[in-house]
A protein has these predicted regions:
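Short hydrophobic targeting helices and cationic amphipathic motifs
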Residues: 217-219, 224
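Conserved alpha/beta-domain cores
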Residues: 1-210, 214
Length: 225
């Protein structure tokens, strides 16, 4: 797979002189840094040999999926090796809740009736549980590697409510099924606008607190001096 990816990128760059592809190779189902290092070393050795044999130059990146809870917990360690994270929210949801999407359909209806769950965790990201893991991993990853690229792949990447949450915790991109792309783009734009409006409101509030109005100062003087 590594040879195929690198060869494809080299061929494209050769045919299109104005293009400069930098392939990203993602390692799935990682939960231990030693495991990530082992696989990443194989990828680098293979990729570098292909590049050297072609007497070419090519920059590539190695990252990992964050799709098991342990990976989210040790994300700071994984970021020492990984240049990017992609949160696989389908598997992360399954492993966090302890049931699969296939099994969920057999009992989630009863859970809704009993008000145990308000919504399908495979349709809308569980912000209190799965979302907390994502936020923790994002913060830990950025603490280790400031410029780490963070994204999401899975059905949640096309859900507007989930996209707004991903925006709030600082993820850079979402990927989803092709038919969800238009909705995802609209939701991402709306989430960015909302986030920008909130920041402006916070800055305005902070300025107001730093500069009390003349009326407030007058009342303070009248009552306390």
């Amino acid at each position: 797979q590594t040879r195929a990816i690198i060869n494809a990128a080299l061929d494209v760059n050769k045919k299109h002189k104005n293009w400069h592809l930098e392939p990203e190779i993602m390692i799935p189902l990682v939960g231990e840094k030693k495991e990530l290092d082992y696989v990443a070393n194989i990828i680098r050795t293979t990729a570098d040999k292909v590049i050297a044999d072609k007497k070419a130059n090519l920059k590539y990146h190695i990252g990992t999926m964050i799709e098991i809870p342990r990976a989210a917990v040790v994300a700071g360690e994984l970021a020492e090796t990984a240049e990017f994270f992609s949160f696989g929210t389908n598997d992360l949801t399954q492993m966090t809740f302890g049931f699969s999407r296939d099994d969920a359909g057999k009992f989630l209806g009863d859970y809704y009736d009993k008000h145990i769950y308000e919504s399908d965790p495979f349709a809308h990201v569980d912000q209190n549980g799965v979302g907390a893991l994502i936020k923790m991993a994002a913060n830990s990853g950025r603490a280790t590697r400031k410029n780490i690229h963070l994204g999401v792949c899975g059905e949640h990447g096309g859900d507007p409510a989930s996209i707004e949450f991903f925006q709030r915790v600082g993820l850079d991109y979402v990927s989803c099924s092709p038919f969800r792309v238009p909705l995802a783009r609209l939701a991402a734009a709306q989430a960015a606008i909302h986030a920008d409006a909130e920041k402006k409101a916070e800055r305005k509030s902070a300025k107001t607190l730093k500069k009390p109005s003349k009326k407030i100062l007058y009342l303070i003087r009248q009552n306390y001096f």
